[in-house]
Structure formats: structure tokens, C-alpha cells
């Protein structure tokens, strides 16, 4: 047996061989053409991390999340699942525009540098992702513009005027009642008044449907404490319509029919989970999308649970797409 193993290693380069070991003997025999019948019936498993925001170098929390997701992806492969693991970088928004200005370079140069560093670290840690998406990818940007137009055409997005409070680090809007001690309830930083023309999404139209879905799908938001937080703090008190465009900065995906507006960063970022696997809102989605969606698991930090369990499922409902099977909000891992 020992000699046979050496012969295998000599025929297959070592990195590939050890990956085959991890995935199990079945993949090795698949390469020899002896398990193609089983391949046809392997259940799919689509797992994603939140895409890392490129306002600076990755922090320990980003690394914690990618390692968790990688462990799950590897385990599912060993169980025989046909796994697709997607991660990537979120590259638009006011915060990035300001950071690039401070650095004396263009926003695109800034995000190129940060995204390259993030990918280098993920590769250094040998994470087994299948797709690394960037929200500056041309195909993603084009699809976001089409999604925005579709939602506008069907009456889910309307033009109005925004006046309220904005947290630049979180790229989030808040009402006075949502603040904690007058500061952002998510990060604790000061908020600033914002007043500008904007497009809004009719969150209120879909809120009752989402509440019913959460109540009838207890596995959708995990752990349960996160579900209770979303229901009690946001959904049950009454969901306000969401501002989905900005005019006070330019680093974003332009609204195709009104280019002085750029798409709100969360409508842009959240759609990566479908654009990355070939979604097309014109009805020409790829075979990969039809195979993989809905996602089996969105693994995210607890600080962005609201975006993934309220805004994202409502966007999907408006697009007439099924919701991900589970969103898991993990705790933070902090330095110091």
C-alpha cells in the first residue's frame, strides 16, 4: 500500500494529490472516469461569505469568516456535496471615495490595491473558494444596472427626496429613533445629516410577506437571537422604505436612466450572490445559476445581519427569486 501511494504521488503533482486526499477517494476515482454516474446525482451546496469592504486592509474578523466558511466547504465536499464557495470584495461607496482622495489616488486604484491584498491573504491561507467576485467586475456592474431598472419599471423603486441621518463608515441610513445615544446603532460612530434627491425602494410593500416567511421558516435566520433582533427592532415596528441611490458622491454604479445617481452600495453588494453565478434579470440566467440558487448558506458577521435578512430577501422577492436557505450571523472576533 505504501509503495502504491508513492506511485500515485509521482503521477499527480503534490498540491493536487493532497486536495484529492482532502476531498476523498471518490474524487480520485472520478478523475479515472469511474464515478461519473455518481457525479450526476451529487447534491449541490452553495456557500458564501460576505464580500470584504475595500476601505482598508482586511481585519481579523474577515479572516475569521473566511476560515469558518472554508471549513464548512471542505466538510461538505467530504460528505459528497458538489460545493460552490464564493467570496470576494465590495468596492463602491462614499467611504472608499474619501479614502482614495486621502491617499491621492483614484477610487479604482485604491480598491485594486486593497482587493489584491485581500485575495493574496485568502490564497496564502489556502482557502478553497471557487469564485472571487469583485463588485467592480464589468458583468456585475451591468447586471446591477439592469436589476435597478427592472425594479423601477415594475414600480418597486420610486424617486423622492431623502432627508435624515447617515453613517458613512456603515454606508447606512437611520432615523432619529434608531440611534443609540445619538450615534450609529451598528458601529457607535457619529452620524451626519444628509439631504439629497434619491430613489427609494418600497420595503413596506414586502414587509408583511417577509414577516410571514420568517415565521414559517425558523431555520432562515440563525442563531435565533438574531432573528428576534430583526423582528422586534425592525420588522414589527414597521419597515420604512429604503434609499437606494445617492447623488452626493460619484464612486458607485450609475443608475442607467438617471446617471447623476449612483446605486446605493448595499443594493450593489448584496446582488453579488446571484450575479457571481450568472443571474440575468432578463431571463437569460446561466445553467450554473439555475443549478446553485438558492444559496444554502450565507455566512456573515452579526453587524450586517439586517442587510442580509431584511433588505436582501425583499430584493429577491421583488425579483421573484427564492430566498437563501439560511443566513447565519456569527459573532465578532476582535484584536486586543
Named regions from a protein language model:
Residues 89-95:
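Short, charge-patterned binding micro-sites
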Residues 99-112:
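A charged helix-plus-loop insertion that forms the helical arch/lid used to bind
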Residues 39-87, 139-143, 193-336:
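Structured secondary-structure scaffolds
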Residues 154-207:
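Cys/His-rich short segments
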Residues 110-166:
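A broadly conserved sequence feature marking short terminus-proximal activation segments
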Amino acid at each position: 500500500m505504501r509503495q502504491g501511494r508513492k506511485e500515485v504521488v509521482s503521477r499527480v503533482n503534490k498540491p493536487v494529490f493532497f486536495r484529492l486526499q482532502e476531498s476523498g477517494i471518490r474524487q480520485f476515482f472520478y478523475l479515472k472516469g469511474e464515478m461519473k454516474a455518481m457525479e450526476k446525482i451529487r447534491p449541490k451546496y452553495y456557500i458564501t461569505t460576505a464580500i470584504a469592504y475595500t476601505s482598508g486592509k482586511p481585519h481579523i474578523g474577515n479572516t475569521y469568516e473566511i476560515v469558518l466558511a472554508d471549513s464548512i466547504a471542505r466538510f461538505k465536499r467530504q460528505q459528497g456535496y458538489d460545493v460552490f464557495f464564493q467570496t470576494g470584495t465590495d468596492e463602491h461607496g462614499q467611504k472608499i471615495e474619501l479614502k482614495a482622495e486621502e491617499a491621492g489616488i483614484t477610487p479604482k486604484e485604491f480598491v485594486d490595491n486593497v482587493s489584491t491584498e485581500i485575495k493574496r491573504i485568502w490564497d496564502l491561507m489556502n482557502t478553497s473558494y471557487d469564485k472571487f467576485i469583485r463588485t467592480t467586475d464589468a458583468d456585475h456592474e451591468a447586471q446591477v444596472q439592469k436589476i435597478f431598472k427592472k425594479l423601477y419599471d415594475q414600480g418597486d423603486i420610486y424617486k423622492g427626496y431623502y432627508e435624515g441621518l447617515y453613517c458613512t463608515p456603515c454606508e447606512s441610513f437611520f432615523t432619529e429613533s434608531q440611534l443609540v445615544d445619538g450615534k450609529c446603532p451598528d458601529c457607535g460612530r457619529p452620524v451626519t445629516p444628509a439631504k439629497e434627491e434619491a430613489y427609494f425602494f418600497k420595503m413596506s410593500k414586502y414587509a408583511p410577506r417577509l414577516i410571514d416567511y420568517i415565521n414559517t421558516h425558523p431555520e432562515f435566520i440563525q442563531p435565533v437571537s438574531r432573528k428576534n433582533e430583526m423582528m422586534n427592532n425592525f420588522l414589527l415596528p414597521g419597515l420604512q422604505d429604503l434609499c437606494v441611490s445617492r447623488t452626493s458622491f460619484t464612486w458607485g454604479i450609475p443608475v442607467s436612466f438617471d446617471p447623476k445617481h449612483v446605486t446605493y452600495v448595499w443594493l450593489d453588494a448584496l446582488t453579488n450572490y446571484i450575479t457571481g453565478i450568472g443571474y440575468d434579470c432578463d431571463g437569460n440566467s446561466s445553467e450554473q445559476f439555475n443549478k446553485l440558487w438558492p444559496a444554502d448558506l450565507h455566512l456573515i458577521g452579526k453587524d450586517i445581519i439586517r442587510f442580509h435578512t431584511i433588505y436582501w430577501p425583499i430584493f429577491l422577492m421583488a425579483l421573484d427569486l427564492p430566498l437563501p436557505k439560511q443566513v447565519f450571523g456569527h459573532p465578532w472576533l476582535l484584536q486586543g
